[in-house]
Amino acid sequence: MHIHKIQAREILDSRGNPTIEADVTLTTGIIGRASVPSGASTGSREACELRDNDPKRYAGKGVQKAVKHVNNEINQALQGLSVEDQENLDRILCQLDNTENKSHLGANAILATSLACARARALSLNQPLYMTLNQGDMMTMPVPMMNILNGGAHADNNVDIQEFMIMPIGAPDFPVALQMGTEIFHVLKSVLKKQGLNTAVGDEGGFAPNIQSNRQALDLLSEAIEKAGFRLGEDIVFALDVAASELFNEGFYHMYSENQKFDSHQLIEYYANLISSYPIVSIEDGLDEKDWSGWKQLTTHLGNKVQLVGDDLFVTNPKILREGIAQGIANAILIKVNQIGTLSETRQAIKLAYDNGYRCVMSHRSGETEDTFIADLAVASGCGQIKTGSLCRTDRTAKYNQLLRINELASLPYAGKNILKR
C-alpha cells in the first residue's frame, strides 16, 4: 500500500469555479481520488485556499498553483510512503507547507492529497471508506439538516438568516428521513408558488424567495411540513445557520429585511423569542466569530435549550476549539474538512469535541463537488448529524445517495431523537 504517484488537476465546483482534484496511485495500480469544496461564508481563521489571482483566467480564481504544488513538492515528498499511516502522511504535508494556515502549498492542495490517500487505503483493503475511517467510535446514520430555504451569502435574495433547515428526527431510519425531507421540499415548492414567491434555488439547492422576515420563512416551512402530513416538533424540527459574521457591522447585527439592528444581548433575546415560538433545536454561528463575550452570554442563556454550533467561530481547528471549551463557548462544532486542511487534524477536532461533551455536525460547503467523502466520515465518526444541503442539485444529493448505500451495507442505528439528549 505504498504511493507510486500523486497527480492533481483543476476541475469545476458546483458554482462553476475552479477547484482541485487529486489522484493518489499506489504501486498496486489502485487509485484514490478526492476533490475539495469551497465556501462562500468563510471564517477569517480558516486554512488558506490557494488561488492563482490571475485575472486572465477564471477571474483570478484558478487553482493551477495548488495543482503544481501537488504534482511537484507533494508528489516527491510522499512517493514510496505507505497510505496505512494517515497521521504520518498528514504530518509530512504540514511540515512541507510549514505555515500556520497552510498558505504555502494551499490547504486545498494538502486536503485533496490527504483525502485521496485515505480513499486509496480503503480501496487497497477492499473495504468501504466509512469502515476504514472508523477509529472505534460508535457508528450511526446521521440526521440530515436539510437546507430547504436559503438566504444570506448562499442566495441572491433579501433573507438575512443564511439557512433554514429541517431535521427529520422522528424517522425510524435514514431512508425514511430522506423521504420525509424530500416530500416536504416538494410541498414547500407548491406553497411558495401559491403565494407567488420565487421557486429558484440557491447555492445549496434550497429555495431562495424574497420574503418579509425570518419568521415568515419559518411559517412557510411549518405550513409545508403540515401539508406534507408530518408533525412539527415531533417528526420534524428546525435548525438555523445565522452566519452572524455576515450580519455584523460596526458593533451591531443588522437584520436588513426586517429593518432592525441588535447588539449581542438583543440578538440573544431575538433568538429566545424564536425558540419559544418554533421547535428550533440548533443555531449555528448565532454571533460574530470575534464576539466571544457575546458567545459566552449566548451559551449561558440558551446553551441548555438548544445546540449552539460554532462554524466560523471554531473553523474545525483543534487549537481554537480548545480555547472555546476553556471559556465555555458554544456546545457543538461544525466539521468542515477544508477549514483545517487534513483528515488527521479534522479527526483531532472531532475527538477533542467528544472528550469535552461537545457535539459535532459534519458539513459540506456551498461550493461543492460530486465527492462524497463527508458522508462516509459522518458515519465513521458517529457524529449523528450532517449538513449537506437541500434535496436537489447533484452536488448535494450525491452525499445523500452515498448515505443510502452505506445504510444498505451496514445495520447501523439512525441517530434520530438521540441528538436532542443532553
From Swiss-Prot:
Q: Where is the active site?
A: E204 (proton donor), K336 (proton acceptor)
Question: Which PROSITE patterns would you find in this protein's record?
Answer: ENOLASE
Q: Which GO terms describe its cellular component?
A: cell surface; extracellular region; phosphopyruvate hydratase complex
Primary localization: cytoplasm
Q: Name one GO biological process term.
A: glycolytic process
List residues binding (2R)-2-phosphoglycerate.
E163, R365, S366, K387
> Which keywords does this chain's UniProt record carry?
Cytoplasm, Glycolysis, Lyase, Magnesium, Metal-binding, Secreted
Family annotation (SMART domains): Enolase_C (SM01192), Enolase_N (SM01193)
Cofactor remark from the record: Binds a second Mg(2+) ion via substrate during catalysis.
Identify the residues that bind Mg(2+) 2.
S41, D241, E284, D311
One Pfam short name: Enolase_C
Q: Reaction(s) catalyzed by this protein?
A: (2R)-2-phosphoglycerate = phosphoenolpyruvate + H2O
Q: Give the subcellular location.
A: Cytoplasm; Secreted; Cell surface
EC number assigned by the record: 4.2.1.11
Which GO MF terms are attached to this record?
Answer: magnesium ion binding; phosphopyruvate hydratase activity
Q: Which residues bind Mg(2+) 1?
A: S41, D241, E284, D311
Q: Does the keyword Ligase apply?
A: no
Q: Which domain of life is it from?
A: Bacteria
Q: Specify the pathway.
A: Carbohydrate degradation; glycolysis; pyruvate from D-glyceraldehyde 3-phosphate: step 4/5
Tell me the PANTHER family matching this sequence.
ENOLASE
What is the annotated quaternary arrangement, including any partners? Answer: Homodimer. Component of the RNA degradosome, a multiprotein complex involved in RNA processing and mRNA degradation.
The task this protein performs is described as: Catalyzes the reversible conversion of 2-phosphoglycerate (2-PG) into phosphoenolpyruvate (PEP). It is essential for the degradation of carbohydrates via glycolysis.
Which family, according to UniProt?
A: Belongs to the enolase family.
| Name of the protein | Enolase
